[in-house]
């Protein structure tokens, strides 16, 4: 068959898309000088020299297309080591719980996904790193971005929840180490942050950030078991809840709120003139009866400029001295209030300043037996221990370090995306 009737399609892969090009062939002419050009064979990504009259492309177009085709050497796949990475190889301490009955302090590591057990006397004033007694971590644990923690001294159990991605509460026994499976796993609403046990009620309360709820479960709930009751609604005062305590003696639930609220769904948002908009309010600490359910209004609210609340995180209750302690992440401080405070009230004590060693406080815990206050630093690879009544710009009694002093903390908080600023040549990582 002549070249006039011999036409072949050529497929060219560019950026993973196959573009079919059909180009008509030229008539063979003996008076025309013979020229050669190139064709791309899609099966091999190779260039082959062909004579005029065969299927061909202009050389300028061909060169551009050839440059866009990845070579076999440039294709990456399999178990490949990255060129470089930004990561924190040390623990980032999140929440803390003290158990004087068993002489234990338990902390969660949000960075590498684990639970750390320390002796209650751990720490020193040197630059030495303090190794944990036990460290639960590994794929079998199911832990991811670990947040709140609570301990049951009688049953020697530790409870923790995954924030943002795991949507699970996991329960482990004391004194286990390594890559171990949890005793129990409970599915919880998305965005769980804080935990609070009430052993008298045999219940555990969980603060859920995004839908602005507090869910109360049986202590031993597991699987897909539903909560016994839920506090939620436009009048409940729950606005991005984080820290939570369950006051067994007063039968109250206390919650630290960042101040952001939005309707959970269309039904709650309403329609037309009855639409309820989202809002940004000042941070607060709200209190509820232990049996509160639904859109229950708080019985008390600590809120206002005098409170100095600024991104309140973890909370701890000192029932013996009628005080509540709050980790105030926004200005690297710890605030202490009377348990029954209400309104725009100033804290009883404030620990803040360069000497305190507080940097990105995420969790707090009161040890009334040893008269001490524990604070976990999310941005400093450390936990600092103060006298319970410490105030002002005061140095801690002890420091529990998991990295040498001055080691920078990457500060990732479950990054969900990445972008590159070509003007400033910076990598942007929203958390």
Model-derived regions, located:
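N-terminal Sec-pathway targeting helices
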Residues: 2-16
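Hydrophobic membrane-insertion alpha-helices, especially the h-region
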Residues: 12-26
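Blade/loop signatures of beta-propeller domains
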Residues: 33-79, 125-126, 295
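Conserved beta-strand positions in repeat-built beta-propeller and related beta-rich domains
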Residues: 59, 89, 98-100, 107-112, ...
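A short beta-strand motif characteristic of beta-propeller blades
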Residues: 81-87, 132-139, 181-186, 227-234, ...
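Beta-rich, blade/repeat-based domains predominating
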Residues: 87-102, 139-155, 188-203, 234-249, ...
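Short loop/turn segments immediately following beta-strands, especially the blade-tip
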Residues: 119-127, 171-178, 216-224, 288-295, ...
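Beta-propeller blade signature
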Residues: 280-289
């Amino acid at each position: 068959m002549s070249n006039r009737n011999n036409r072949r399609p050529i497929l060219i892969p560019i950026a993973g898309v196959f573009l079919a090009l059909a180009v008509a062939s030229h008539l063979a002419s003996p008076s025309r000088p013979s020229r050669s050009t190139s064709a791309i064979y899609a099966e091999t990504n190779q260039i082959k020299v062909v004579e005029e009259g065969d299927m061909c492309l202009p050389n300028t177009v061909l060169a551009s297309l050839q440059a866009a085709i990845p070579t076999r050497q440039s294709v990456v796949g399999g178990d490949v080591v990255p060129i470089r990475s930004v990561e924190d190889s040390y623990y980032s301490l999140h929440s803390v719980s003290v158990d004087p009955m068993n002489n234990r302090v338990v902390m969660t590591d949000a960075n590498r996904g684990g639970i750390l057990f320390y002796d209650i006397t751990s720490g020193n004033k040197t630059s030495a790193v303090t190794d944990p007694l036990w460290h639960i971590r590994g794929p079998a644990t199911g832990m991811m971005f670990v947040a709140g923690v609570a301990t049951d001294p009688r049953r020697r159990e530790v409870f923790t929840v995954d924030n943002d991605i795991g949507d699970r509460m996991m329960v482990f026994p004391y004194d286990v180490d390594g890559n171990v499976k949890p005793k129990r796993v409970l599915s919880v609403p998305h965005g769980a942050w804080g935990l609070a046990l009430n052993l008298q009620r045999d219940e555990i309360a969980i603060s859920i950030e995004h839908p602005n709820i507090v869910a109360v479960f049986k202590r031993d709930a597991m699987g897909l078991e539903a909560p016994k009751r839920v506090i939620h609604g436009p009048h409940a005062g729950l606005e991005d809840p984080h820290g939570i305590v369950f006051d067994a003696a007063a039968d109250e639930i206390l919650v630290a709120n960042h101040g952001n609220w939005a309707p959970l769904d269309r039904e709650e948002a309403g329609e037309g003139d009855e639409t309820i908009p989202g809002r940004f309010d000042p941070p607060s600490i709200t209190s509820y009866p232990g049996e509160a359910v639904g859109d229950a209004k708080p019985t008390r609210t600590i809120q206002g400029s005098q409170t100095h609340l600024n991104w309140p995180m973890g909370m701890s209750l000192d029932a013996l001295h009628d005080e509540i302690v709050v980790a105030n992440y926004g200005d690297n401080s710890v605030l202490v209030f009377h348990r029954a405070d209400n309104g725009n009230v100033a804290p009883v004590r404030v620990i803040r300043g360069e000497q305190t060693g507080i940097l990105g406080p995420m969790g707090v815990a009161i040890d009334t037996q040893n008269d001490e206050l524990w604070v976990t630093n999310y941005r400093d690879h450390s936990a600092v221990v103060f006298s319970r009544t410490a105030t002002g710009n005061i140095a801690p009694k002890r420091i529990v370090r998991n990295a040498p002093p001055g080691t920078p903390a990457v500060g990732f908080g479950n990054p969900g995306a990445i972008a590159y600023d070509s003007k400033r040549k910076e990598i942007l990582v929203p958390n």
